[in-house]
């Protein structure tokens, strides 16, 4: 040991270099262990909707169009909003876990569940009136009627989806994501059987796919809830139901509201708005058939970024947080190059996954290069958005996204798509312009960040949470 210290003193540069290399290697391993499962979870949960629509496709083109439009409408008005709301947990749970205030995670999850359940009530009313909204925005009445019916049968899904998002982020903050992968895998596998029974055998027709979504989401919630309740790995973070979850709702909402209007809502809303607008183009089926699955890869990286940054800030390690940002951005660049290259290489054959119609195949082939560019830009900004959530910059992120998408992206996309008759390409070019503006703004914010100050903010946030926890224990408000 003494000789090793003498060597370090004699060769300070070499020792420092080896130390940095070890830290980088450890950070890479941590993020791979996080991002890999998170990508799998995103893909598996996204596949629920895809599988449902695929089964509906066997019933004809009209039910397929209706289910696709209803799914997009549900995403705009429900799923994305709840996903954005739940992302507030990335900040509070991640930083509390990093600060070793484990008991606060359970209270924060319960508080988030309460808020998301209450928000689901008005959102379900919106879903019940889907047909009227679609007709108002100019959709074909026959498609709007079927879409409205599909959306009404999806209403039970929204309550389960909110709870599922809370459970996912509760475990993600603890770097415990393998159970989420397993439960999602089991649910998605069973979803195929459930869809087959309800869509093709029960007589429910295309409405059976919506019912299948609800069953599968609730099944996933039950599986994860059982894990949290009975697993020893959650014994410190889940200490039972607490009355304290009902306290400090207003301060929590100050983080929830900008979270809901950040990446998971403003960005997704703009994207889904353009998808719904594509239904007003001459061939809506073609415009809504473009692949979105690859977006789940940077979304998984974003989850890893928010978790690692929030954990390091909570533990009082500014250098660790900065290193986490550098590593995840490197992952993002590599991923965007690989996926973009693959999309371009398969552009002439990917269309056959949707149809044997030469028009469809040709259309998809012309769209994929644009999608490849969009994905590369989206990967970069999605990861930066994860960094923002880990730091608690939701308000800043909301304003950046508002300007990027609604002052630049959506107007430019609609202008190209409809006024200049560029079609679906114009809509996607609008999204690309928004991604460029968003990426530049978030990059500048991250580059000029004072990480020591961010640690102080995280410490203050975790300390206030700890005081709430101590109050809860002293007043006997922790319930079994």
From Swiss-Prot:
The chain crosses the membrane at residues 36-56, 69-89, 118-138, 143-163, 180-200, 208-228, 255-275, 294-314, 326-346, 360-380, 396-416, 428-448. One of its GO terms (cellular component) is membrane. It holds the Pfam family MatE. GO terms for molecular function: antiporter activity; xenobiotic transmembrane transporter activity. Its main location: membrane. It is found in: Membrane. It is a multi-pass membrane protein. This is Protein DETOXIFICATION 15.
